[in-house]
């Protein structure tokens, strides 16, 4: 590359109306599958896990969700949003990765229930459950995530995220959050 390190980022999305959206992710995040539920807890500026160190500990996709070459499919059926991802070859000599996310918003206005799962095809398996409620300018959410790493030397993580944000006006929001791992 003659010393020119270039980051090539490309995505392809095909909108199919009521049949949903099919996507392909080149070298960036796909936004499908568990990526939809990576962090549902509201924040005004920086999520709790970003303020402590460089590692995004306790998030559903931290154990190896490789988004390069990943296919995604998103659609809504009534009050249920469905998102799936599939990566046939995330890396050399690796088995296929798959994940999904479900968000149900039909119980009452402003309430969303979510569930997601990711499997790297080997040993890493992650799951998450969450609830999010929005009323006027206030949003509150609670999310539990379980991260099982494939590597034997890595410590698995059970994380709980909770937060609330209030939009004071169009230019100012205030939030508080906590993460326990």
Segments and roles (model prediction):
Residues 1-181:
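Outer-membrane beta-barrel proteins
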């Amino acid at each position: 590359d003659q010393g020119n390190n270039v980051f090539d980022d490309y995505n392809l999305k095909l909108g199919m109306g009521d049949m949903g959206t099919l996507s392909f992710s080149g070298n960036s995040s796909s936004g499908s599958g568990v990526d939809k539920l990576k962090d549902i807890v509201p924040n005004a500026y920086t999520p709790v896990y970003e303020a402590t160190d460089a590692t995004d500990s306790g998030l559903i996709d931290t154990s190896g969700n490789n988004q390069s070459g990943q296919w995604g499919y998103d659609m809504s059926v009534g009050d249920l949003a469905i998102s799936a991802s599939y990566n046939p070859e995330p890396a050399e000599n690796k088995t296929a990765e798959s994940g999904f996310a479900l968000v149900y918003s039909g119980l009452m206005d402003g309430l969303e229930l979510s569930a997601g799962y990711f499997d790297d095809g080997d040993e890493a398996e992650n799951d998450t459950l969450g609830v999010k409620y929005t009323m006027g300018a206030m949003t509150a959410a609670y999310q539990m995530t379980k991260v099982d790493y494939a590597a034997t030397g890595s410590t698995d993580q059970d994380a709980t995220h909770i937060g609330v944000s209030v939009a004071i006006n169009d230019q100012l929001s205030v939030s508080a959050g906590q993460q326990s791992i």
